[in-house]
Each structure stands twice: as structure tokens, then as C-alpha cells.
């Protein structure tokens, strides 16, 4: 499977935003990201990409 869990990095700590994400789409308006998981749930997050760990299946936002 190619899903990843998305975390928000604040003050050096990672907080889970959504599990099983398979769509990660930056919005045209800077600073927002649309996430969709394997269950069809969507979330619009006010954050930007920090980094991606393919080995750990993690997407880190800031």
C-alpha cells in the first residue's frame, strides 16, 4: 500500500492529522493542503509541507 500518515510539526512535536492518506494536494491558495484518506474522508489543513519520509510512510506539515 502507498498510504501515509500526516502529522503537524509544532514546537518540535508531531501531532497526527490524518491516517491512511493517499491524496495530498496543495491548494492554489498558499499555506493550505487538501488531504484525502482511504475511507474518502477529506480534510483541508492550514499548513505547508515540511518533509516526507517514504520509508516511514509519513508526511510532515508545518
Cite the ranges covered by each PLM segment:
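Compact, glycine-rich, soluble single-domain proteins
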Residues: 2-10, 15-62
Amino acid at each position: 500500500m502507498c498510504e501515509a500518515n500526516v502529522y503537524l510539526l509544532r514546537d518540535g512535536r508531531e501531532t497526527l492529522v490524518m491516517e491512511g492518506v493517499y491524496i495530498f494536494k496543495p491548494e492554489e491558495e498558499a499555506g493550505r493542503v487538501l488531504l484525502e484518506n482511504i475511507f474518502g474522508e477529506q480534510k483541508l489543513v492550514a499548513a505547508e509541507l515540511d518533509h516526507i519520509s517514504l520509508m516511514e510512510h509519513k508526511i510532515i506539515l508545518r
